[in-house]
């Protein structure tokens, strides 16, 4: 960790955890600043390692980090309350805070189980902010275990009570065509685990940690390139399929008005006709 940033982590861990959470959504579409994924998760994992002997503190750090990324990543939920704002606007603050607060319990649980499992093994780091590298459970092994626990927590968030799979770690790589292709074998949760393993390697402070993290990125890039090249050859051998996507972009305040129904239908047909002038369209998606 860079010196000033490390000092902030030591002096104000809770604020840093929250700020790190704010960084992560900026790695996803549409902003796509991938290094912020590594800075955000790298800082969170660093904090988890440094405070792994204090379960209550770990729980709070995990919750703040999760709340930060979900609060910023779910800002769009508030837009729904601006439709008929005179009725629903008062609910907006509750929606944009309570939902992230509840979902952040999954990340808090991941951090808590991380600390509890290290304590159970009798290998939690000392209270020193510089854990010795000679511990039975190395920093690298602990951080890799945290990557697994975080992935399990994200899977739980994506499935329990119908799930809410938003801003999963796999979406950081999945937003880049030449990193996303392992998803065809591993799924989005497996892709996220790979991304988090690369974070763990980079934060591990082992001799080849950074090299290992970059090598994992490079492997995903090569696999994606080979996959896309293969798919391109297969697609080139098949007849082309023309797909037209129509988005009428209706005003939400008018979308369900019975008096506007015919106008909406006619607009959709006009757009479909205009889009299909260049040739025959096989599929129309609205």
Q: Each predicted region: which residue ranges?
A:
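Soluble catalytic regions of membrane-associated enzymes that act on cell-envelope
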Residues: 226-286
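Membrane-embedded alpha-helical bundles of multi-pass enzymes
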Residues: 2-231, 265-269, 273, 283
